[in-house]
């Protein structure tokens, strides 16, 4: 692999995505036979990326760690610390790249973070290996509409987070304080919601969408129901660890994300 964009972590992951245009189905596939043995990682190769693609990449990197962070059960403090440090690093360096896209050090930090975020390291110890409901929800958006994966994730994540956070409150509170550095005053609910708002504000800094309409698409209610149905089928009926989602939950999240 010769890495030209820091985003999906393909250089160290066992994951891939397959799109079937007949029926507009987009599905993830994981197999260790697909994990590269060798990768060339030169941050200079990412310096010509459009700002939008850089922002999408930074968002995707964050999401790969967020998906593994918000789980119920089996979490390890050392893994949490690695994940939190990685997310803080991505946020800090993404902000640098907004104004200085050819900053070598920032490009290098983001590139290495992308590799570590999706090679399994940030999920070590979690019982189910991650939540990944946001990815499943976005895959249906990306399957039906022409949207960048990172942008789709940013558009759906806030609505997903507000829908599930009460079922995974200690993790959301911890994320808010340790990653987003929000004011810890108030109830756990207050802190968790401030954390969700803080990361949405960060997405806006990157000019990423925080709603489906901001993706430039306007799905009908029938299309929302279709996406929820396809997502449920693709997940064999349910998805998630922070909160297990079923088809009706998925529809409600899509609806809230408009």
Model-derived segments and spans:
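A glycine/threonine-rich phosphate-anchoring loop and its flanking beta-alpha core
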Residues: 1-78, 174
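C-terminal charged capping/lid subdomain of soluble metabolic enzymes
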Residues: 172, 179-258
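Active-site segments that bind and position negatively charged phosphate/pyrophosphate groups
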Residues: 68-198
